Amino acid sequence: MRTAYCGQLNLSHVGLEVTLCGWVNKYRNFGKLIFVDLRDREGCIQVYFNSDAQKKTYVRAADLKQEFCIQLTGIVRSRPVSQINKNMSTGFIEIEAKFFLVLNVSNPLPLDIHQDNIEENRLKYRYLDLRRPIMFHNIQTRSRVMALTHRFMELEGLLNIDTPVLAKSTPEGARDYLVPSRLHINKYYALPQSPQMFKQLLMIAGIDRYYQITKCFRDEDLRSDRQPEFTQIDVEISFITAKKIRELMEFFICKLWKEILNVELEVFSQFSYAEVISRFGSDSPDLRNPIEMKDVSSIFQSLGNKLFICNAGCVDTIDTQVIVMNVPSGFKLTRNEIDKYSDYAKKSGIQQFLWMKIQMNDCKEITAIDGPIINLLNKNFLQLLMAQVKIENNDILFFGFNNDKNLSTTRMLSALRSKLGYDLNLVKQDSWKPLWIVDFPMFKKNTSGKLVSMHHMFTAPKDNDLICLKRNPELAVSEAYDIVINGCEVGSGSVRIHSYKLQQAMFDILGITRENQQKKFGCLMNALKYGAPPHAGIALGLDRLVMLLTKSNNIRDVIAFPKTTGAMDLMIDAPD
């Protein structure tokens, strides 16, 4: 029906007759000339109808309206110099219309595809929202990422194998979506939260190197980077170390950024879990933000077992964790702004919040200090503080106090760190800061004090140390690893347990009875008895990767037909 796409025409096509198909993007009637911007998935091109040259075509064109779907034949012409539009990729040319056919008319649109619209309307009329160029760009980028993934994985010798969607319910952290069986009354399939067991079984089967781009389903509370159904790039490889699989995935992500954005990513930083929590208060830190935290409890405890009085009130110096955040160029903050940040920190659980502004000369000598903490400023205190905290001229120091040993003070301050970074324009928006996080604890305690897996229950402890795992599970460190880019966790993986005894011990620690071990995981447990190889894997969030690559605000903008934060599909009115 067409010989070219609108957005692909250029000056080299001048004089050629072309047939185009698309939608009326804009319509302008100037009397003897009618101008239409014709749009297809590749872009827009200006078409003009001349009443003198093509009378019948011109008369019919007067009835065109926005979003009519048409087929048009015409001649590619170069625009007069005065009419060149450098804001369009086709702005140097236009089409002189000879004939057109209306393929379908359009009612007035319920939303304006030339501007932003409220989220509810965008999701209800998603098929119209996808006509917006930015949305097409996002979906096209997603397609490119998937194609690049397939090419990369095949070149690396991984086999693309799909695993079942109708599976068995297993305790993996989130709630399952259940599908009742018609043939087996009162029995249910579960939609997989991940293909975890299946890909491990593939390794035991000798497949050796596996991948797939797969749908996963989790019935959990949603946010901007979560959907009830999401897509992940799933990888599992036998006879590989954690270091080698990290190198492979780092190479893959660098290729994505190079191919899609023409950006050379720097070598990924690597931090332990304990380090990112202590320095940034988060296990998915945005390293573009230069603000770091430091535990200075010992400095305050050196003041003695007493309360000190300042403008902010009384603060206990003993048995209290004190975390300082050094905010570059924060001297300019007003007292009113500081008070707002103080309130923000206290809403996160911080019991007391103090500040200190510092000015220095070129010799790094302090010349001015301000803040409610000023009555503490003896020479010894300042020397101890400057020995632990890197302070520059015009910085402001924020001190957060917390005496609840069950709560992490740095985690409480993490949201404030992020807010300050954006409020003060400290985050370099055009930069990329990828990192690996390693050495996660094997377990954490849930709200009832029970041990649960930090990652999942198939993650191996470091060095496969069964004795350490049994003796003191709370101190066990896992062979898990996460990828974080600009504060967004885009991947998570681990070396897997390949020993029957070690997997059994893991289940025992988690309080899963031997009976339930067989009931829930009997297939995997039995398979581990038959020469299971060492293996490791990772899952990358495709939606999150594309969100970053397109600089979108949430993953709904990179999924063709997403759900709301309430897990509703407004377009098809599901669930019903």
Swiss-Prot record:
Region (Aspartate): 196-199
This protein's record includes keyword Membrane: no
Keywords on record: Aminoacyl-tRNA synthetase, ATP-binding, Cytoplasm, Ligase, Nucleotide-binding, Protein biosynthesis
Domain of life: Bacteria
Catalytic activity: tRNA(Asp) + L-aspartate + ATP = L-aspartyl-tRNA(Asp) + AMP + diphosphate
Gene Ontology MF terms: aspartate-tRNA ligase activity; ATP binding; nucleic acid binding
UniProt family annotation: Belongs to the class-II aminoacyl-tRNA synthetase family. Type 1 subfamily.
Organism: Blochmanniella floridana
CDD domains, sorted: AspRS_core (cd00777), EcAspRS_like_N (cd04317)
Recorded GO CC terms: cytoplasm
Protein name, as recorded: Aspartate--tRNA ligase
Location(s), subcellular: Cytoplasm
GO biological process per UniProt: aspartyl-tRNA aminoacylation
